[in-house]
Amino acid sequence: MLDPLSPEQVSDEAALLPIQEIIAYLQEHLGQRMTAYISGVKDPKMVARWIARQNLPRDESQIRLREAYQATRLLVDAYGDETAKAWLFGSNAELGSQAPAYMLRQAREWEDLRSIVPAARAFARATPDHPPLLRS
């Protein structure tokens, strides 16, 4: 298990780590199918091919995967794998009642992604004594 990182460190890692390490982390914590779903590919076996450097994901998939890494890493560090999965695949009021994983998969440009990591960061900071801020 990796040591928890600050949000700034997670952001730096997401930008600097080789894409294969990003994908391997997501596969370890979310599973191969969920990683494939987020990236926008239909065949989960592509994830293993990417890690093995047999292929590279397309640029838009790499952007999705790097954003997913940031959100996942923050949530796994704060709560563990199961809560991270539940957050990514559950409806999220801060994101217009859409699942973050769906938003990642559907993203076509940077603007489509910019609200996901801040929402994950806010949720990861929440504790039983300080729940996430709810919007009215």
Name the predicted role of every residue range.
Residues 1-136:
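Non-transmembrane "mature" sequence context
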